């Protein structure tokens, strides 16, 4: 019996020795920092003392990785600070403060280890990776900034006038328990400065203003702008362009032109034909005028200069124009003098429905006309003549108007001297 027991014990020892050589034993859980086993190890393994031993290299690497995770998240990146890194709630909540005041309190507080003042107190230092995890990635209840992106945070700094002074990159080396192998951690620091953002001058924060970014207009709006400007031309602009640079399709009758003369050109375009208009000019007399005046009423130097206009691209027809006058002064053979509607103007009317071209309809005391502003070369007219007005004593069988509705006077109301010349 004793031989059997000794034989079984020898086999168990042989199995244990084989398992240790091949690394098949169970991996122990990393000891707690305050446990008695960690503070006073009873039987330290030779693998901890000799990092170059070939007893269990896989076990040593696995232990280092497991122990590095909590240290890298909490202790390795952070500097010592008081307990409780949660900003106070209520009136002192950092989320409700403006950006400069909020940032100044973050830098001046000891609750955060990812941002601090430099030695001079004129710049603030940001540990980029730790700042993104410690402040930007906080939960909603403890949120400090509305954004969660480090790029958006740096964009806010630029809008408030912060300037990057320099950038520093260094490595932090840590040890895992009692192992002699060092682990390096890359840290990236950003230095930002502002003349109004000082450690000892918080009253200057009110001078910091956020700039508004200027956005360029969309390209399609810029392309549509010339088209809209070309299609929305005013009638006056169109007429001015016709005088200065006529179109190729326009047929122009050549006439003698002077720099300051009143002569104009006859145009034929898309507008309907209009009745020729006569505007008297006391300074210029033309022998080619188609309409002459009786010698008893007008002098030789006051003959009217006729300016025919075939196309009038002007505004719509104005209200009816009333021609005042006395029945004794109005006849069907001579012109009738009336007051002009506006200075520097040309009167034109539609010829549709007229008895003959150049004649006004009979038995009509109101005449619809169109007022078109003339160019600067045309002199101002003092009187307007309407040729071939019918006498009011003619009775129209289809009209109920008689001459008794006209006020009896010796001449036109606006020209009292004309009555003396006609008597």
Curated annotation (Swiss-Prot):
Bias (Polar residues): 243-254
Region of interest (Disordered), residue spans: 1-56, 215-303, 397-423
Compartmental location: Nucleus; Cytoplasm
A UniProt-annotated Pfam family: HSF_DNA-bind
One annotated GO molecular function: DNA-binding transcription factor activity, RNA polymerase II-specific
Any single GO CC term annotated in Swiss-Prot or TrEMBL for this entry: nucleus
Cross-link Glycyl lysine isopeptide (Lys-Gly) (interchain with G-Cter in SUMO1): residue positions: 215
Residue ranges: DNA binding: 98-282
UniProt keyword annotations, A-Z: Cytoplasm, DNA-binding, Isopeptide bond, Nucleus, Transcription, Transcription regulation, Ubl conjugation
UniProt tissue specificity: Testis-specific.
Extent of Basic and acidic residues compositional bias: 1-25
Family according to the record: Belongs to the HSF family.
Protein name, entry field: Heat shock transcription factor, X-linked
Organism from which the protein derives: Homo sapiens
């Amino acid at each position: 019996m004793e031989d059997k027991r000794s034989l079984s014990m020898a086999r168990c020892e042989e199995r244990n020795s084989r398992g240790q050589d091949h690394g098949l034993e169970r991996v122990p859980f990393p000891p707690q920092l305050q446990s008695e086993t960690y503070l006073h190890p009873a039987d330290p393994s030779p693998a901890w003392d000799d990092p170059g031993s070939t007893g269990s290299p896989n076990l040593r690497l696995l232990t280092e990785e497991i122990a590095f995770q909590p240290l890298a998240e909490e202790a390795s990146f952070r500097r010592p600070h008081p307990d409780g890194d949660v900003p106070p709630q209520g009136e002192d909540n950092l989320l409700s403060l403006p950006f400069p005041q909020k940032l100044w309190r973050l830098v001046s507080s000891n609750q955060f280890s990812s941002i601090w003042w430099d030695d001079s107190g004129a710049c603030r230092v940001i540990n980029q990776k730790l700042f993104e995890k410690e402040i930007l990635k906080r939960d909603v209840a403890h949120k400090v900034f509305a954004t969660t992106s480090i790029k958006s945070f740096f964009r806010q700094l630029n809008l408030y006038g912060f300037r990057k002074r320099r950038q520093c990159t260094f490595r932090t080396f840590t040890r895992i328990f009692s192992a002699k192998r060092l682990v390096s951690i890359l840290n990236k620091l950003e230095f930002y400065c502002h003349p109004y953002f000082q450690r000892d001058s918080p009253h200057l924060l009110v001078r910091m203003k956020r700039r508004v970014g200027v956005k360029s207009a969309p390209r399609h709006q810029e392309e549509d702008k010339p088209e809209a400007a070309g299609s929305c031309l005013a009638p006056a602009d169109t007429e001015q362009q016709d005088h200065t640079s006529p179109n190729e399709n326009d047929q122009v009758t050549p006439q003698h032109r002077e720099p300051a003369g009143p002569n104009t050109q006859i145009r034929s375009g898309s507008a309907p034909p209009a009745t020729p208009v006569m505007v008297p000019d006391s300074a210029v007399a033309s022998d080619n005028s188609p309409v002459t005046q009786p010698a008893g009423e007008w002098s030789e130097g006051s003959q009217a200069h006729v300016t025919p206009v075939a196309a009038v691209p002007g505004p719509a027809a104005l209200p009816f124009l009333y021609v005042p006058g006395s029945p004794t002064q109005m006849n069907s053979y001579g012109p009738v003098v009336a007051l002009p509607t506006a200075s520097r103007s040309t009167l034109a009317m539609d010829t549709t429905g007229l008895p003959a071209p150049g004649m006004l309809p009979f038995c009509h005391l109101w005449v619809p006309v169109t007022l078109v502003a003339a160019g600067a070369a045309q002199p101002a007219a003092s009187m307007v003549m309407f040729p071939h007005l019918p006498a009011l004593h003619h009775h129209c069988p289809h009209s109920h108007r008689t001459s008794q509705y006209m006020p009896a006077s010796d001449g036109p109301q606006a020209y009292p001297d004309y009555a003396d010349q006609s008597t």
